[in-house]
Amino acid sequence: MTNLDIFLIDYEIYKANPNWWLDITEIFLKPGLIFKASFNNEHTNILEKISAYGSDLSISFEKNVLGVEGIINEEMIRDFKASYKVKNGDGIDYYSPFISLEIGENYCSAHHGSELYLSNLSEDELEKIYKIINPLDQYLKFDIS
């Protein structure tokens, strides 16, 4: 099994492929997996959306950051992909609405999508990820172990 860390080093990646983060994240979005997400507490609309998917959520609050933990379902995946868009603030692109996002045991996104930590990747997952990141290598730094 392989571990792959991906770091965004050039925000011009948006011009080459604005959906690179979602394309990688989709590989790991599977119903039944546990997710953990954190986001700024002023983004209560995110909490409202996530809460609509079920009552089996755990919600925490710490230093202006809301945390949510729950189980991914088909409706959540469909809506997440349909509503996805990159937001720009202060000259920085935010690829994820979440400060951090963990999916299952293999996926962690940090700093609004500018860092990805992928662990225990199968050959199939690694091949899919390489198809996404190889054309973008000038915008990303990656470490493999």
PLM-predicted stretches and their roles:
Residues M1-S145:
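Structured alpha/beta or helical-core interaction and ligand-binding surfaces enriched in interleaved
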